[in-house]
Amino acid sequence: MNFYQDLGFLVFGSRLKRLGDTFINDVNRIYKDHEIDFDASWFPVFYILSQKKEISIKEISNDLKVSHSAISQLISSLQQKGFIKSVISKKDARHKAITFTVKGEKLLQKILPVWNALEKAMSELVEESVNSKKILKALTTIETGLHDKNLFERIDAHL
């Protein structure tokens, strides 16, 4: 008996969390084994900065659909480590923006090959099964459905 598989949707969230934790732990092991001072939890901010070069905390929060407070805490931590800095926005001098420091840019260059390898490894994993190929589309469908009507409302309707 496989506990998680047998319980189906009752443990769907637990399975996703367990899978996510496994991915994060393995990726962090890669960074550590390759002596790269990076934590997978920093990925969203680093990725967005790698694409946009300069962005406000509010824009990051909106892009990631994460609270302003959570992003501010992560930004503060990355600033203390010397990877990013706050600057006057080039778009609007009345606002501040976040950008990489030289140290952050150097770290980005070290982690880009890991991101490429990660994307290849995940693509290979998904290619191992016809069902796996549908997972990203299925996740998007679930996320959209939850945006339309959250899980609390869906459960409460059955009580």
Give the ranges of each region predicted by the language model.
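Charged, amphipathic alpha-helical coiled-coil/dimerization segments
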Residues: 76-137
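C-terminal regulatory/oligomerization modules of transcriptional regulators
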Residues: 1-5, 128-159
